[in-house]
Amino acid sequence: MNDVLDLTCDLIARASVTPEDAGCQALLAGRLTAAGFACEHLRLGEVDNLWATHGSGAPVLVLLGHTDVVPPGPREAWTSDPFDPQIRDGVLYGRGVADMKGSVAAFVVAAEQFVAAHRAHAGTLAVLLTSDEEGDAIDGVRRVANLFRERGQAIDWCITGEPSSTERLGDLLRVGRRGSLSGTLTVKGVQGHVAYPHKARNPIHLAAPALAELVARQWDDGFESFPPTSLQVSNIHAGTGANNVIPGELQVAFNLRYTPHWDAPRLETEITALLDRHALDYALRWHRSGEPFYTPEGRLRSVAREVLGAFAGAPPEESTGGGTSDARFIAPLGAQCIEVGPVNASIHQVDEHVRVADLQALPALYRTLIERLLVE
């Protein structure tokens, strides 16, 4: 095996199910300290965060990643133990290998190689890691970003190691993400016997026109490379289970993935106004996961396009699809943000895996990006 492969396997073997870090950051900090980085451990709540820097001043380039992983699910469903990394037919298997311990290991190896070759590089190279990305994402990069605001810590560019590639390494460049807003709607009615509907108020019937209007609405036509804003109902619950009882309450959970045309407060206002027009007796609880971000054409995006094109053999698709990432907390600091990482076909699945050849190529990809930004 080689350095990035060994380090990835060491990380996989640490069962860092969110929000646990399981010693991953201590291992990585040891490597970065030995390479000349100044490391600051930020324990916030029950979450471990690591901020490592080399050099000083502007521009500041951050390599952003997470050491936590999602639960493996039933271990018996895996071909091998999810926390015992195994190579079979040129493929490395283990929980978190794609999302995103392989990228984190490649970050560290690339950073070590870069500072060894460029001790007096321009600006600051930084590595930011958290153990709270796959869970609630409250005490991780969200709080670290607030700390950076208090300190006046500027960030010019951010490369997140999320698994962005679709079929081959470097075939997709993530240049933004949609915002995410969740709502839980509770509509009150009056419970009663189905034979006496005049003595009850059915919350399902009362809410149906409002829900129909809500899901039929076209929020926008998209933005740049963003698909249109989408509202999806994810859960509906009402009733006792009996078919002769009109329910007294309806609960609906929904989520919006939205473009930069919107922000969370405006969406909340629009939806509240729609519900009010239908004169419902309701309560509505919101959860804001993050605002959208978008990196327009600029140095980071153009450099990444050239580097990924060289690695993949064709220009990358430039996309804003997918879920959310911690870059949503860094972008509001004024940073240009992109996401570059391995193939994402198996993330969060049983037998999560990455091609060994892709993993071995990642450090060179990241190092080339760093050199283009901090040396040229």
UniProtKB/Swiss-Prot annotation:
The active site is at residues 68, 133. It catalyses: N-succinyl-(2S,6S)-2,6-diaminopimelate + H2O = (2S,6S)-2,6-diaminopimelate + succinate. Pathway: Amino-acid biosynthesis; L-lysine biosynthesis via DAP pathway; LL-2,6-diaminopimelate from (S)-tetrahydrodipicolinate (succinylase route): step 3/3. One of its GO terms (molecular function) is succinyl-diaminopimelate desuccinylase activity. It comes from the Bacteria. Its EC number is 3.5.1.18. Homodimer. Catalyzes the hydrolysis of N-succinyl-L,L-diaminopimelic acid (SDAP), forming succinate and LL-2,6-diaminopimelate (DAP), an intermediate involved in the bacterial biosynthesis of lysine and meso-diaminopimelic acid, an essential component of bacterial cell walls. Belongs to the peptidase M20A family. DapE subfamily. This is Succinyl-diaminopimelate desuccinylase. It comes from Xanthomonas oryzae pv. oryzae (strain PXO99A). The lineage of its organism: Bacteria, Pseudomonadati, Pseudomonadota, Gammaproteobacteria, Lysobacterales.
